[in-house]
C-alpha cells in the first residue's frame, strides 16, 4: 500500500455518486494524477474545501488501483474568490485546462507547478492585468514543456541585432532582417514585444506582474502566442480558448501605448 504526502492543485473536480468527488490533481511529487475524495460533497466533510477547483492544498494520498484516494488534506490557498469574478475565472479555467491537457499522468514538472500556483494567486489580486499575466503564463508554460521560442537572437545565424527582425512560428523564434528572406510565414512584431518576451522568459511571473504593458503590446503578444500554441500544443482546449476570446473581445483592445 502506497501512502504519500504531496502538495497539489485541483485541475478538475467531477461529482461522483451522491457525495464523492473525482479530482484531477497536479502534484509536486507525482505530477498529474486522478484521486477520489470520498464524501467530499458532504457539508461537514474535512475534504470539501480542498476538493474545489483551483484549490492548492497538502494532500495525503493512498494508492488504490489506477487512482489514488484522498485520505487527508489541508488547504494552503483556496483561491476561492476567483470563482466570483467571471474574467478571472475564465482565465484560471483556461490555464488549468492548458496544464491538464498538456502533461502526462505521473509526469512531474515543478517549475510548471510553481508557475500555476503563482498565476492563480495573481488572479486573486485586484491590481493584476489578467490579460498580460495569462500571456506571460502561456510563454513560460511553453518554455517549461519544451517549446521555448528563441527571442534573444536569430534562430538561424544567432546574430543579436534584432532591429527589423521577424518572428517565425514554424522555425521557433526570431529571424534577423537578413535571415528572414530565407523563410516563409514570417510575422512582423514590434521590437517592444520581442523585448517583453525576453523579459518574461528571464523572470518569474510575480516579477513580470509588476511590468506596465500597453494594451497594444499585450494584444500583439496574445496574438503571436495564440498562433504558437496551436502549432506546438497538440491537446489545446479550443472550447476554453473560445470562452477566453469572448472575454477578451468584451474587454476590447485599443492602440494606446
From Swiss-Prot:
InterPro entries, sorted: ARFGAP/RecO, DNA_rep/recomb_RecO_N, NA-bd_OB-fold, RecO, RecO_C
Gene Ontology biological process terms, A to Z: DNA recombination; double-strand break repair
Keyword set includes DNA damage: yes
SUPFAM superfamilies: ArfGap/RecO-like zinc finger, Nucleic acid-binding proteins
Keyword DNA damage: yes
Cellular compartments per GO CC: bacterial nucleoid
Record keywords, A-Z: DNA damage, DNA recombination, DNA repair
Function: Involved in DNA repair and RecF pathway recombination.
NCBIfam families with a match to the protein in the record: reco (TIGR00613)
Entry's family note: Belongs to the RecO family.
Protein name: DNA repair protein RecO
Source species: Clostridioides difficile (strain 630) (Peptoclostridium difficile)
Amino acid at each position: 500500500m502506497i501512502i504519500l504526502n504531496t502538495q497539489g492543485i485541483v485541475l478538475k473536480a467531477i461529482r461522483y455518486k451522491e457525495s464523492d468527488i473525482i479530482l484531477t490533481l497536479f502534484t509536486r511529487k507525482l505530477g498529474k494524477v486522478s484521486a477520489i475524495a470520498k464524501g467530499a460533497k458532504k457539508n461537514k466533510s474535512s475534504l470539501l474545501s480542498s476538493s474545489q477547483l483551483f484549490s492548492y492544498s497538502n494532500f495525503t494520498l493512498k494508492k488504490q488501483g489506477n487512482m489514488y484516494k484522498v485520505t487527508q488534506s489541508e488547504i494552503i490557498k483556496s483561491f476561492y474568490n476567483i470563482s466570483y469574478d467571471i474574467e478571472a475565472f475564465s482565465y484560471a479555467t483556461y490555464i488549468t485546462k492548458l496544464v491538464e491537457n498538456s502533461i502526462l499522468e505521473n509526469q512531474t514538472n515543478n517549475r510548471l507547478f510553481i508557475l500555476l500556483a503563482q498565476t492563480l494567486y495573481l488572479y486573486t489580486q485586484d491590481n493584476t492585468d489578467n490579460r498580460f499575466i495569462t500571456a506571460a503564463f502561456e510563454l513560460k508554460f511553453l518554455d517549461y514543456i519544451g517549446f521555448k521560442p528563441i527571442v534573444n537572437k536569430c534562430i538561424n545565424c544567432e546574430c543579436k541585432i534584432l532591429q527589423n527582425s521577424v518572428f517565425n512560428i514554424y522555425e521557433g523564434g526570431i529571424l534577423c532582417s537578413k535571415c528572414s528572406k530565407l523563410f516563409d510565414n514570417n510575422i512582423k512584431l514590434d521590437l517592444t514585444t520581442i523585448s517583453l518576451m525576453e523579459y518574461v522568459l528571464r523572470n518569474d511571473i510575480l516579477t513580470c506582474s509588476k511590468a506596465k504593458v500597453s494594451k497594444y503590446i499585450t494584444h500583439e503578444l496574445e496574438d503571436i502566442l495564440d498562433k504558437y500554441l496551436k502549432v506546438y500544443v497538440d491537446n489545446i482546449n479550443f472550447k476554453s480558448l473560445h470562452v477566453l476570446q469572448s472575454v477578451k473581445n468584451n474587454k476590447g483592445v485599443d492602440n494606446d501605448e
